Structure formats: C-alpha cells, structure tokens
C-alpha cells in the first residue's frame, strides 16, 4: 500500500469528506482554509478562503455543487464548489462544530458549541436558494440542548428520508430527533466518553460511532440498538464502514496534547481495520506521526483517506491481497 500524501494544510486536519463519486476529497483544518483535492493523484485543486478561525467541519451535497463548513470564527458558510465563492454566511452565537447537507440537498443542518453563556444548539436551514440574505433568515428549526441534556453536540448525521437527525454528544449519548415535531425520539448511552465521529454505512441502515472511551460501536441507525463493539487501547477519533466489504476502519491515538513520542513506528497512530461482524482486528496501516483525526472510505471501497494531527491527508489504496483476504 503506497499512500498518496496530500500536503497543503499548515495545521491539524479536523475533517475529510469524499464527494459522492469519490473523485474529490474535501478537507478542513485548523488553518482557516478548507481545501479540495483530486483523490486519484493528490493534486490540490484549490482552497475556500473566507473563514477567520479553525474550520471544524465540512460536507458536500449529492451533486457536488455546494459545500458547507462550520468554523471557530462563529460562522457557518455555504460555498460554490467549482468557483470557491461564498454563497452565504450564517453568523452563530458560538463555534459551529458540525454541518451536514440532507440527502435531498434542500436542507442543511449545523450545530453550535456550548460556550459564552449559550447552550449547544442544532439548526435546520433551507438551502434551496442560497444568497447573502441567508445571514438574516430564520432557520426552519432550532433545537436547544437545554437543562435536561446540557451537553454539547460533537457529531451529527441525517437519518432516513430527511425526517430525523442523529446527534452524538460530549457525554457519550446518541440521540435521534424528529424534525417534524422537534422532539427527541430515542437516546442511548452505550459510550462513556465523548462521541468524536459518527458515519453511516453505504445503505444508511447502520452507523459507526467513534468515542474517546477507546471503543467504536456499530448501531442500528433507526432503533439505535448497539450491534457490535470494536475495542482498542486508545481514544478513537474517527471510524468508517467499508461500502463493499464487512470491514470497519478506525483511527485515533493519544490525544494531541498527550503525545510525547511521535515515531510512526510506535504503533500508536495506525489506522486499524476490524471485521464488521466478528469484531476482530486483522490489519494496521502506519503512516501518520500524530493522532488520526478523521477517516473516510472512498465510495468504491477500494481506498480510504485519513487526516491527521500532523496536517497531512493520506490516501491509502488497497493492494490485491486485501480483496483476496479470507477471514478465518
């Protein structure tokens, strides 16, 4: 496995996403400039300039025409993917931590941190016709994580048919919200640490969560029933499900502030492949000299990308031996 090294960010990567076809990778980092790359050869196509703080999240719509980012400069921005121009900016009360387009692309959601006297809030906005007036438009729906929840949203997904939103929280809980009634449908507390990341399977029936409690867990995306647990010795920052095999890839490592040795050989910063059903680790891939902050599978399942605290995005393309591998 000879990786592609995508070098362009000056600071730690916060999130990476493939578009639906998998020909583009979008990456955000703590350096104010979300970037877009060709996934085939690692060429950087451009940056999206406009944020004034660390960019925490990114998502691209189904047609790869629009991009949404949320940042520490207390704003969420919508971009034209092709030209890099800002379509609209939404001011927030605190840092925007998560942002996602719905499957239809008609709506988008973003959440803000619990900070400066404001509770963590979740917003649903209409993004069919975005222009500069979106900064003053009221959201379609606003959910406040009030006294009963009192924990900030750290990751978020859209549920089936754009009817629900799934949120992962700082206290390890995962909740499903009905967007019609603005009420909580279900919640589980299987994790004991902050939920760093959640990603859906290709068909949307399952989701994998990555937590600081050193485990990743597989849930039914409708009932939130915990199906499988993948155990490691270190915090898991990101996890993704293969679209073609029954495999899960996990990435993490020590927290950035606890890292003392940054040797790639120490084995602390590998991405780890687990069997989806048997919960057993069967491979590790070295490379980063710092924790892995974000992972994403290519939609064709033949490669995956990792973004690390070292500021690099690495694209790992699987060898022939990966496809011939039989789990015993």
Swiss-Prot record:
One Pfam family this sequence matches: EIF3I
GO cellular component: eukaryotic 43S preinitiation complex; eukaryotic 48S preinitiation complex; eukaryotic translation initiation factor 3 complex, eIF3m
The WD repeat ranges on this chain: 8-47, 50-91, 148-187, 190-229, 287-328
SMART domains linked: WD40
Domain of life per record: Eukaryota
InterPro entries reported in the protein's UniProt record: eIF3i, WD40/YVTN_repeat-like_dom_sf, WD40_repeat_CS, WD40_repeat_dom_sf, WD40_rpt
PROSITE patterns, per database record: WD_REPEATS_1 (PS00678), WD_REPEATS_2 (PS50082), WD_REPEATS_REGION (PS50294)
GO biological process entries: formation of cytoplasmic translation initiation complex
Family as reported in the entry's similarity comment: Belongs to the eIF-3 subunit I family.
HAMAP family for this protein: eIF3i (MF_03008)
Protein name per the record: Eukaryotic translation initiation factor 3 subunit I
Lineage: Eukaryota, Metazoa, Ecdysozoa, Arthropoda, Hexapoda
């Amino acid at each position: 496995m000879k990786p592609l090294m995508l070098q362009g960010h000056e600071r730690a990567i916060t999130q990476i996403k493939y578009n639906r076809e998998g020909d583009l990778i979008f990456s955000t980092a703590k350096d104010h400039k979300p970037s877009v790359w060709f996934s085939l050869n690692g060429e950087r196509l451009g940056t999206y300039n406009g944020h004034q703080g660390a960019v925490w999240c990114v998502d691209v719509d189904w047609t790869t025409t629009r991009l949404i980012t949320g940042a520490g400069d207390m704003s969420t921005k919508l971009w034209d993917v092709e030209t890099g121009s800002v379509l609209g900016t939404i001011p927030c009360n605190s840092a925007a931590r998560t942002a996602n387009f719905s499957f239809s692309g008609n709506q988008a959601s973003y959440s803000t941190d619990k900070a400066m006297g404001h509770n963590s809030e979740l917003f649903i906005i209409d993004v069919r016709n975005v222009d500069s007036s979106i900064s003053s438009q009221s959201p379609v729906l606003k959910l406040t994580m009030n006294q009963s929840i009192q924990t900030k949203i750290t990751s978020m997904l859209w549920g089936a048919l754009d009817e629900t939103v799934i949120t992962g929280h700082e206290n390890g809980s995962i909740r499903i919200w009905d967007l019609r009634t603005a009420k909580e449908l279900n919640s589980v507390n299987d994790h004991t640490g902050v939920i760093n990341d959640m990603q859906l399977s290709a068909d949307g029936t399952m989701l994998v969560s990555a937590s600081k409690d050193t485990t990743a867990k597989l849930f039914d995306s409708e009932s939130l029933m915990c199906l499988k647990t993948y155990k490691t010795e270190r915090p898991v920052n990101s996890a993704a499900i293969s679209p073609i095999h029954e495999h899960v890839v996990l990435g993490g490592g020590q927290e950035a502030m606890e890292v003392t040795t940054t040797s790639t050989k120490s084995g602390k910063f590998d991405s780890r492949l687990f069997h989806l059903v048997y919960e057993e680790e069967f491979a590790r891939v070295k490379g980063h000299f710092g924790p892995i902050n974000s992972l994403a599978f290519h939609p064709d399942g033949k490669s995956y990308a990792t973004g690390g605290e070292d500021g690099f995005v690495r694209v790992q393309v699987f060898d022939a031996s990966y496809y011939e591998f039989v789990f015993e």
